[in-house]
Every structure is written in C-alpha cells, then in structure tokens.
Design a protein with these regions (language model features):
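Short glycine/proline-enriched coil/turn segments at helix->beta-strand junctions
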Residues: 14-16, 33-36, 75-78, 100-104
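Short catalytic/ligand-binding loop motif for oxyanion handling, primarily in non-cytosolic enzymes
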Residues: 28-29, 48, 88-93
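Helix-loop module immediately N-terminal to the HCX5R catalytic loop
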Residues: 38, 43-80
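Catalytic cysteine-centered active loop of the rhodanese-like fold, especially the PTP/DSP P-loop
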Residues: 73-102
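Cysteine-dependent PTP/DSP-like catalytic domain, specifically the C-terminal lobe
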Residues: 96, 102-133
C-alpha cells in the first residue's frame, strides 16, 4: 500500500505491518508500534530530470537496502505501508516493485511511479538473486 506522508504520520500503527518511509530531508513522524520502520531519503526526481547537483537521486545502495529490508520483514508481516511526501511516485515505484517481486496485486495501469526508483529496485533485486546463487 502506498500513501502520502501526512496519511502515514496520522495512521495508527499496525503491529504486523512494516513501513518504508521516504522523505526528502526531515524524518516523518511515524507512530510507534509498527513491526519495523525503514527510513530513507532521496528526492522525487528521475535521472533524466535531475538538473541540479543538490537533487539527491535514489542510489543503488539505497535500493539494495530497501530490497534487503523487504526480504527481511516479509516472513513476519501481513502488510507493508510505503509513503513519500505526495504518495504518488516514489512510494508507488517501491510498491510496484514489491508487488512484482512477491506476486502481489498492483494496478499496473498506474503509470505515475518514479521510473528511476523502480529501475534501481529492479536492478538491486537482480543483484540479490545473483548473490544468493
């Protein structure tokens, strides 16, 4: 499930759900009580639209951390809440990757996801599969 930061901050915690919290600068105020929370920071820009050095794209390392986190919590949770500021593109990209990696439902007609974030996660997932061989 992907949503915006405001909704994630106001959502009551669910003890058998995990959270991926994506912000630009400051941490989101996620309530205590979730199974686990992974925090990461990167801007909502795609590689082709990154015009300034200060714009922080998602890195391969951040993608690997998210992939490894999802695999670590997956056996212990019944749901995953992914949020970013607007709840439109970064969180959607993560949710799309999770749905594909774990054969879960996702509206694949939804095309507003951040393509750079999605590519980074797909590549990190492939690297993980190679490490496990």
């Amino acid at each position: 499930m992907f949503t915006n930061q405001n909704t994630a901050e106001n959502n009551p915690s669910i003890e058998d759900w995990a959270v991926i919290s994506i912000t630009d600068l400051d941490d989101a105020r996620i309530k205590q009580g979730w199974y686990a929370v992974h925090r990461t920071k990167f801007c909502d820009v795609d590689m082709q639209h990154a015009e300034h050095e200060r714009e922080m794209l998602m890195t391969a390392e951040q993608a690997t951390e998210i992939v490894d986190y999802v695999y670590a919590v997956e056996p212990h949770i019944s749901g995953l809440l992914v949020h970013c500021k607007g709840g439109v593109s970064r969180s959607a990209a993560v949710s799309k990757w999770v749905a594909e990696a774990f054969n879960l439902k996702f509206n694949h007609q939804y095309n507003l996801y951040n393509q750079h974030v999605y590519r980074q996660l797909a590549e990190a997932h492939e690297r993980r599969k190679l490490r496990e061989q």
